[in-house]
A protein has these predicted regions:
Chain A
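Short glycine/proline-centered loop/turn elements that form peptide/ligand docking sites
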Residues: 165-169
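Short hydrophobic, aromatic-rich alpha-helical segments embedded in or entering the lipid bilayer
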Residues: 221-234
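The alpha-helix within a helix-turn-helix
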Residues: 173
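Short, charged juxtamembrane terminal tails flanking transmembrane helices
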Residues: 2-5, 263-269
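Glycine/proline-centered hinge or cleavage motifs at structural transition points of membrane proteins
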Residues: 176-178, 190
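Membrane-water interface segments at the C-terminal ends of transmembrane alpha-helices
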Residues: 9-43, 52-163, 187, 191-212, ...
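Short coil/turn motifs that cap or connect alpha-helices
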Residues: 89, 179-180
């Protein structure tokens, strides 16, 4: 059957020139994980997991990463649509701007956020003066820092999906009298749903692991802004085993969520 | 291939000869040590950045043929790096606890000696706009405070000083090291931070320091030690001796440290 024929055709024809670097690449990515697993203090694991700070940090991480992803979806999907579907002057510049957080060291991103949303920042001063809202050192600040770093992943994935999608469906909808908004919600969105999901998953994973921008912009306070990566970093200062345990939890949660999502929604048609 | 190896050997020989010359020439200078050459790698606490950079330059001048390279970071991170086999000659820690981590793992050579001590002050923006005069003022409503996390030496000292003062403080943030806490004051995001006196001395144009009596109960001792696997043991010993000499003490004192 085609199912059994496909892998055989795939495995036998791999040239050594590709196979060797591929295996090396895999080892390079997998070995550090194996190192964590080998050095984990398995015997004291239950006590360490039961420590009060661990669950607090984990809950905060899951909540903030999820809210940040929602924020990215709300703003990122329209942005991706704009980049993919509308010809406007300076589109290349806008696209380059969107990818800036990808290359910016997250700590610098955190400082940049402080300069804008901080107490003395352009927007931050207005927010504080008008609404009494201060974002630094708050949970909302964590969400903001995570969204800043993670949104490019979503925008790039969704823009790619939009460009790959067949525009004839949208044109057909237009000829049938659908307005552009209706076309977007009833034709475009369902068409690129798998791309949006993939982008959202990437975005969520990036937000979950965010460290530099978070500690710089939102600071570190248990229960309010101390997410798992921050807890790992501070545990490293005193107790490497605790840091390994925290990392394993983060690893397990993200692998579980990514695997579950992959199986359900992101399988290619 | 062979030619290249030969050339390398010649260069190596020449370098050996040169360093021999350096050692001979140094006898004329005011060198406090005996024939020290080569690179000395020093792992030092972040709060020593300014003073040790100065001391390193002075040491190189006093010992021609030597080069001092530094790795400045949080003491606990440095202790971890040393215990994981980092090739360091000297370790200078901001707290005895981190030094103990290294000596307990059998990576010290001899006994650590305390060469300096540091005290906490309250760093406030230039001019002290909130009029902060002591630890109790930090709990006033509307005053945002950054402290170090208790896992790092400055955080442990802050916790102790607050306990001595009987002040219950909820900080806006617990920073990962003392320089990060100071940066939050410089950026204007907090109204005060508990940092070392030396950090305030190093940033005179950005912040003012407010002294408080309870800091005397939470003094940080800085121990220094030559490491067991030091690639340049003679250089390491000479550097430690230099830090503890009159010249070294002068630099440390100017930076705001107290020397025993």
């Amino acid at each position: 059957m085609s199912v059994s024929a496909a892998p055989r055709r795939g495995t036998l024809r791999v040239p050594l020139g590709l196979l060797v670097p591929a295996v090396l690449g895999l080892a390079f990515l997998a070995l550090p994980l194996a190192g964590l697993l080998l050095r984990a203090p398995w015997s004291t694991l239950p006590q360490r997991l039961a420590q009060p700070g661990v669950l607090t940090a984990l809950r905060l991480s899951l909540q903030t990463a999820t809210i940040a992803t929602a924020l990215c979806l709300l703003l990122g999907v329209p942005l991706a649509w704009l980049l993919a579907r509308v010809e406007f002057p300076g589109r290349r510049v806008v696209r380059a701007l969107v990818t800036v957080p990808l290359v910016l060291p997250p700590v610098v991103g955190g400082v940049a956020l402080l300069l804008v949303f901080g107490r003395r920042g352009i927007v931050g001063r207005w927010l504080a003066g008008t609404f009494g809202i201060t974002l630094p050192f708050s949970t909302a600040g964590v969400v903001l820092a995570e969204a800043f770093v993670a949104m490019p992943f979503l925008v790039i994935a969704v823009e790619g999906a939009l460009r790959g999608a067949d525009t004839r469906y949208e044109e057909a909808a237009a000829t049938l009298g659908a307005r552009r908004w209706t076309t977007f919600t009833h034709v475009t969105l369902p068409l690129v749903a798998p791309g949006i999901t993939a982008g959202a998953v990437l975005c969520w994973a990036r937000a979950l692991g965010e460290f530099g921008a978070t500690i710089t912009f939102a600071g570190n306070f248990p229960g309010r802004t101390q997410t798992m990566p921050l807890a790992v970093y501070l545990a490293l200062e005193t107790d490497m085993k605790a840091a390994i345990v925290l990392s394993l939890i983060l690893l397990t949660v993200s692998v579980a969520v990514l695997a579950a999502l992959r199986d359900r929604w992101i399988t290619s048609p | 291939m062979t030619a290249r190896w030969t050339r390398t050997a010649v260069v190596a020989l020449a370098l050996t000869a040169l360093s021999g010359c350096g050692g001979g020439a140094k006898a004329n200078g005011p060198a406090p040590s005996h024939g020290v050459t080569g690179t000395v790698t020093v792992f030092a606490a972040a709060s020593l950045t300014e003073s040790f950079t100065r001391i390193g330059k002075d040491f190189q001048a006093a010992n021609p043929g030597t080069k001092v390279t530094f790795n400045f970071a949080g003491s606990s991170a440095l202790a971890t790096q040393i215990n994981q086999g980092a090739p360091a000659d000297v370790f200078a820690s901001a707290a005895p606890a981190n030094m103990k981590t290294v000596t307990d793992a059998g990576n010290g050579d001899g006994t650590p000696v305390v060469f300096a001590s540091n005290q906490l002050v309250i760093a406030v923006p230039k001019g002290n706009p909130q009029g902060i005069a002591g630890l109790a003022d930090l709990t006033r409503p509307g005053v945002k405070v950054a402290v170090c996390a208790v896992q790092v030496p400055c955080g442990a000292a802050a916790k102790k000083a607050l306990a001595v003062a009987g002040v219950k403080l909820t900080p806006a943030t617990e920073e990962q090291d003392v320089k990060a806490a100071l940066a939050k004051v410089k950026l204007g995001e907090v109204d005060a931070a508990l940092v070392y006196r030396t950090d305030v001395t190093a940033a005179p144009s950005d912040v003012d320091g407010v002294q408080f009596p309870e800091s005397a109960q939470a003094v940080n001792d800085y121990p220094i030690e030559v490491l067991k696997n030091a690639p340049n043991k003679a250089g390491a010993q000479a550097f430690v001796a230099y830090v503890r000499s009159g010249e070294g003490r002068a630099v440390l004192t100017a930076a705001g440290f107290r020397c025993p």
